[in-house]
Amino acid sequence: MKCRGCFWLQQAAGVEFPGMPGFNLNTNTDTLLKRDLDQYRGKAAHPIFVKNKLKHLIPFEHEDLEKWTQSIHFGLSQRHFNTVHEKTNIKFGGGLDDVLLNTKTGELHIVDYKSTAQLARDKAKIKKLDEAFLLPPTNPKEPDYKASYRRQMDMYQWIMRRKGFAVSDIGYFVYVDGQHIGKKGMIDESNPNKANMEFNTAVIPYEADDSWVEKALTDAKRTLTLKNCPSHADGCENARFLADAKKALKIDMEDSQVDEYAKLMNVSGKIDYEIGES
């Protein structure tokens, strides 16, 4: 859980926080990348893996693969991408992007597609898409935007193992990085009804660790059973918004109570559960 307070509000109290609009371009790149791998599924390594000296990895063919990718419907059946944690009775799941079969070991590797665009104008400031790209920032005050990527890979490996598969600790992030440096534009002058964006590609290995997942589910169940909302994490944006709104509106509260509430909101401190960032 990124924030126990937000998790409780969403899962126990049914509070819906303002949503973000969908990123259709990102979704479309995921769709196209899967189609790339579908052409080689169960047969041979895709050229992107051959280029990265991973020709022993081929797209995994399984009758339930399409169900595994359906994040919205992850809990519909046991054939979807979920598992029930018996100790907490939490059905835990989501939608994965793809799976590779290691023809040398027989193990599976979880694959996560990612699309990005580095907007720095100075080419020297463009980060290389390698293992260091996924690491936490060296400055602890900087936000760790890749933490959710790493956690998701950890969780998906845990689920896949509980579904009875032999899964390697090594997962792969397949990145496409939209280019702009040195580009005049994207509209095709010979056919102005068309536009093109060029992407650089990368395959980044990540050694996952799912040892924390079961404890996190136990903590989640304990949080769900609380009668009152627990404290929010330090720096929680939702907590700050709620506290500021209460303070601005002063709804049925004295100033001293509002100040105390604002302070409180910013201090750390069978159920279906989709993998997310609450």
Locations of the language-model features?
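Short N-terminal secondary-structure initiator segments
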Residues: A44-T69, E107-E142, A262, S268-E274
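Mg2+/Mn2+-dependent nuclease catalytic core
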Residues: L76-K215
